[in-house]
UniProtKB/Swiss-Prot annotation:
Keywords: Cytoplasm, Isomerase, RNA-binding, rRNA processing. Residues 18-91 form the S4 RNA-binding domain. The lineage of its organism: Bacteria, Pseudomonadati, Pseudomonadota, Gammaproteobacteria, Vibrionales. It holds the Pfam family S4. PROSITE patterns: PSI_RLU (PS01129), S4 (PS50889). GO terms for cellular component: cytoplasm. It comes from Vibrio parahaemolyticus serotype O3:K6 (strain RIMD 2210633). The gene is rluD. This is Ribosomal large subunit pseudouridine synthase D. The keyword Cytoplasm applies.
Length: 325
């Protein structure tokens, strides 16, 4: 049965000039932007008592926004007994270490077998929290740390912290090619113009900022550490492809196998057989949404990336780095 919700909030003075769809995304952060926009277009949003359906309507600050809508029962998602690697847990949050080949949220082509289905099994009460408490996502084959909220207040505050860029997320990756230095990619990301399942750097896309630094050089690859300011879909993968240094194994974004000259058959087979993007969410730091305590978590790099790193390092020690280094 659908749940009737009526929520009210006031537009902040700092939101002066924002589009209505942007303003309500900040005011009602428990819900996804797509869901809020759907409600807006369906006449479920009132501004000072008047129904407004145009997303581009500007707000001035001080308006009272009322949201009257039906929230579909999230029990339509099946609770499934799927193991979770719990790094930390208390009454308000859970931090998990996600393995590869594990989708975070049900969607087209993946109706179950996801992190969300597992959460509903291990924490039945989390069904009362929008999106079962999921605050941010990792791609199916990206491994590493995610924080999940157990309660609506915890989720609301974590989502706001994410929007304000107060959650630090660091990643370890192996990029193809010789990167000489670190830097920053500040390029907007939007849906790919022809490949609708992929993203791309796009002038009219959403702002996206990725910081990166070189951790270790190999002959034809580079181990890097990255930090996200924003969290767009496939952000690191898109930005590294934009730099012409796609991630090892990421064939969707140009990560074709590159074999160092004279490489052993073992290394050649490992590179050609690495069948996921070499990307791991290694560190997560944020203020606890309820207590305010600063928390920091680390997840060890998974075995497949460790083995690849060791093999590339051995190859580099044998042949040496190119003269440019």
């Amino acid at each position: 049965m659908a749940q009737q919700i009526v929520l009210t909030n006031t537009v902040k003075d700092s939101q002066l000039g924002q589009r209505l769809d942007q303003a309500i995304a900040e005011l009602f952060a428990d819900f996804s932007r797509s869901r809020l926009k759907e409600w807006l277009l369906d006449g479920k949003v009132q501004v000072n008592g008047e129904v407004v359906t145009k997303p581009r309507t500007k707000v001035m600050g001080g308006e009272e926004i009322t949201l009257q809508a039906e929230l579909e029962d999230e029990e339509r998602w099946e609770a499934q007994d799927i193991p979770l690697d719990i790094v930390y847990e208390d009454d308000d949050i859970i931090v998990i270490n996600k393995p590869r080949d594990f989708v975070v949220h049900p969607g087209a082509g993946t109706p179950d077998g996801t992190v969300l289905n597992a959460l509903l099994h291990h924490y039945p009460d989390i069904a009362e929290v929008p999106r079962a408490g999921i605050v941010h996502r990792l791609d199916k084959d990206t491994t590493g740390l995610m924080v999940v909220a157990k309660t609506v207040p915890a989720q609301t505050r974590l989502v706001r912290a994410l929007q304000k860029r107060n959650i630090t997320r660091e990643y370890e990756a192996i990029a193809i090619g010789r990167m000489t230095a670190g830097g920053k990619v500040d390029q907007p990301i939007g849906r790919h113009s022809t490949k609708r399942t992929l993203m791309a750097v796009a002038p009219l896309g959403k702002p996206a900022v990725t910081h990166y630094r070189v951790a270790e050089h190999f002959r034809e690859h580079t181990r890097i550490r990255l930090r996200l300011e924003t969290g767009r879909t496939h952000q690191i993968r898109v930005h590294m492809s934009y730099l012409q240094h796609p991630l090892l194994g990421d064939t969707a974004y140009g990560g074709r196998a590159r074999i160092p000259t004279g490489a052993s058959q073992e290394l050649t087979d490992m590179i050609r057989g690495f069948d996921r993007q070499a990307l791991h969410a290694v560190m997560l730091r944020f203020e606890h949404p309820i207590t305010g305590e600063e928390l920091e978590f680390h997840a060890p790099v998974p075995d497949d990336m460790v083995a690849m790193t060791e093999a590339l390092r051995k190859d580099t020690e044998e042949y040496g780095l190119p003269d440019e280094f």
